[in-house]
C-alpha cells in the first residue's frame, strides 16, 4: 500500500513454482518500477551523511508516502480515480491463474501493494478489504514496520527491510490527543492510540487514514498490552477515577470488538505485556499505596486462567520510573534495564534475569521514559536519541539476538524530537 522508489517483484525468496512465470514477473515489474509520483523534496536520510562524514555510500532515495490504494499511477489512471491497467492481457490472474498469482503476491513487500492494487480490480479489492493480509498471516508471511511518535499528533514509520521512512498521516486534531500522555498498540493492520477521556483513534494501513474507534468495555490507561496476529490483549491500568484495575480484555481487529477476559489475580498499573509461548504475560507494575510489584502473571488462552509468577521482574530497574521495557524475539524475553543501561534476558527455567551487555550508548531516557524498546521480527530495536540543547536526532539501533554479547547496529537516523512518546511494531 505504501509507495517507494524502484521495486521488483521478489523482495524475499519465492517458491520455485513462481520462478518460471516470466509474464507475471514482467507485468509486476512494469507496474512497480513505473511512473509514479513521489515527493521530490523529501529524501530518506543516508546514514553516512547523517554522521557528518561527507560521503554517500548510495544516492538518496525518495521518501515513500502512504497513499490510499485508489491513488492513481501515471497514465494508467482512470477517470473514476482508481488506477487500473487496461487491456485483456494486463491482468496476471488471467495469464497464470488466481492461486499462483496470489501465492506470489503474498511474498511481495507490502510497501508495493499500492502499485499492485492498480493492476486490476481483483487486486485492489484484496488489498482494500485486507484479504491479502489475512492470507499472509495464514501463510506465516509478515513484515514488521516500526511506528513511533516524537511529536504531538505526528507519527513516523520505518521499514527496516528496505531501510525506508514512510509518511503517516497526521492524527485528527482532537483536544484529547494534544498532550503527550497517550498509549498505543499495533494489531493486525491497525495502529490504536489511546488518550484521555477514553478516546481511541485507529489508523488503518488499508485506507491510510485515522478514524475514531470503539473504547474498551472498561476504559483504562497505564495498562499492559501486547498483540499476536489480529488479536490484542490488555490488562491492568487505572480507570477514570484512578482506581487500579485487575480486569483484562481482548481486541479483535477483524471485527473491531472488545471482549472481556478473566481478571488477573492482582490489580496493577504501569505494567507491561508480552506474548510468549502462546500465552499473555503481564509483568511488573504498581499496586495500591504505590507498592511496586515484582511478580508477573501468565494468562493461558486455552484454559482462560491466570497464574502468578513470583519475582518475575525482580532486578529490573529501580522502584521509580517507566514500566518495564520488555520485548520477545523467538519466544525469548528481553528487557532494557534503563537504570543500568543493560540489556537482559529472562532465564525461564530459573526465573531470573541474565545481563547480556549494554544498550546503545546514545539512547538515553528519563527513568525509562522517552526510550522505546521493541521486538521487530527477529531483531530487537532501541529507539531514542542523545539529549541536546539545539535540535534533536532520533536513532534506531537493532541487534539480532545470538549467543554473543549484543553489538548494536545503527540502522536509521533523522532529525526529530528525541523523546519517544509512543511506539508500536506492526507485523503483517
Regions found by a protein language model. Give the residues of each.
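A structural motif specific to WD40 beta-propellers
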Residues: 166-168, 211-213, 259-261, 307-309, ...
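Beta-propeller blade signature
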Residues: 155-160, 200-207, 246-255, 294-303, ...
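Eukaryote-biased RCC1-like beta-propeller repeat architecture
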Residues: 162-166, 170, 208-209, 256, ...
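Short active-site-adjacent structural elements
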Residues: 364, 382-383, 389-394, 404-408
Amino acid at each position: 500500500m505504501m509507495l517507494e522508489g524502484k521495486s521488483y517483484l521478489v523482495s524475499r525468496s519465492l517458491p520455485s513454482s513462481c520462478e518460471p512465470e516470466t509474464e507475471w514477473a514482467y507485468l509486476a515489474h512494469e507496474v512497480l518500477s513505473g511512473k509514479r509520483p513521489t515527493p521530490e523534496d523529501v529524501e530518506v536520510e543516508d546514514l553516512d551523511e547523517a554522521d557528518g562524514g561527507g560521503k554517500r555510500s548510495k544516492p538518496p532515495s525518495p521518501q515513500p508516502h502512504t497513499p490510499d490504494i485508489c491513488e492513481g499511477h501515471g497514465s494508467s489512471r482512470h477517470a473514476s480515480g482508481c488506477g487500473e491497467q487496461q487491456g485483456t492481457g494486463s491482468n496476471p490472474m488471467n495469464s497464470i491463474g488466481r492461486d499462483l498469482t496470489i501465492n506470489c503476491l503474498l511474498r511481495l513487500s507490502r510497501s508495493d501493494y499500492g502499485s499492485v492494487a492498480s493492476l486490476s480490480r481483483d487486486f485492489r479489492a484484496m488489498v482494500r478489504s485486507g484479504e491479502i493480509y489475512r492470507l499472509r498471516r495464514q501463510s506465516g508471511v509478515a513484515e514488521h514496520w516500526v511506528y513511533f511518535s516524537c511529536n504531538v499528533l505526528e507519527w513516523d514509520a520505518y521499514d527496516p527491510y528496505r531501510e525506508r521512512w514512510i509518511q503517516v498521516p497526521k492524527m485528527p486534531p482532537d483536544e484529547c490527543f494534544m498532550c503527550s500522555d497517550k498509549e498505543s498498540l499495533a494489531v493486525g493492520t491497525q495502529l490504536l492510540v489511546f488518550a484521555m477521556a477514553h478516546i481511541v483513534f485507529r489508523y488503518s494501513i488499508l485506507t491510510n487514514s485515522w478514524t475514531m474507534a470503539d473504547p474498551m468495555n472498561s476504559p483504562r490507561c497505564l495498562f499492559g498490552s501486547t498483540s499476536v496476529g489480529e488479536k490484542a490483549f490488555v490488562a491492568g491500568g487505572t480507570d477514570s477515577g484512578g482506581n487500579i484495575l485487575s480486569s483484562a480484555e481482548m481486541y479483535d481487529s477483524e471485527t473491531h470488538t472488545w471482549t472481556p477476559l478473566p481478571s488477573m489475580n492482582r490489580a496493577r498499573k504501569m505494567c507491561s505485556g508480552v506474548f510468549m509461548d502462546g500465552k499473555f504475560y503481564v509483568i511488573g507494575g504498581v499496586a495500591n499505596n504505590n507498592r511496586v510489584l515484582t511478580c508477573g502473571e501468565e494468562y493461558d488462552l486455552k484454559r482462560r486462567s491466570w497464574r502468578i509468577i513470583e519475582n518475575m521482574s525482580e532486578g529490573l530497574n529501580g522502584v521509580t520510573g517507566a514500566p518495564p521495557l520488555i520485548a520477545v524475539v523467538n519466544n525469548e524475553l528481553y528487557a532494557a534495564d534503563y537504570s543500568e543501561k543493560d540489556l537482559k534476558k529472562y532465564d525461564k527455567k530459573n526465573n531470573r534475569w541474565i545481563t547480556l551487555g549494554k544498550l546503545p550508548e546514545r539512547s538515553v531516557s528519563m527513568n525509562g521514559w522517552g526510550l522505546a524498546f521493541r521486538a521487530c521480527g527477529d531483531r530487537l530495536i532501541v529507539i531514542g536519541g542523545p539529549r541536546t540543547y539545539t535540535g534533536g536526532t532520533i536513532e534506531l539501533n537493532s541487534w539480532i539476538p545470538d549467543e554473543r554479547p549484543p553489538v548494536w547496529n545503527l540502522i536509521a537516523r533523522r532529525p526529530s524530537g528525541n523523546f519517544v512518546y509512543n511506539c508500536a511494531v506492526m507485523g503483517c
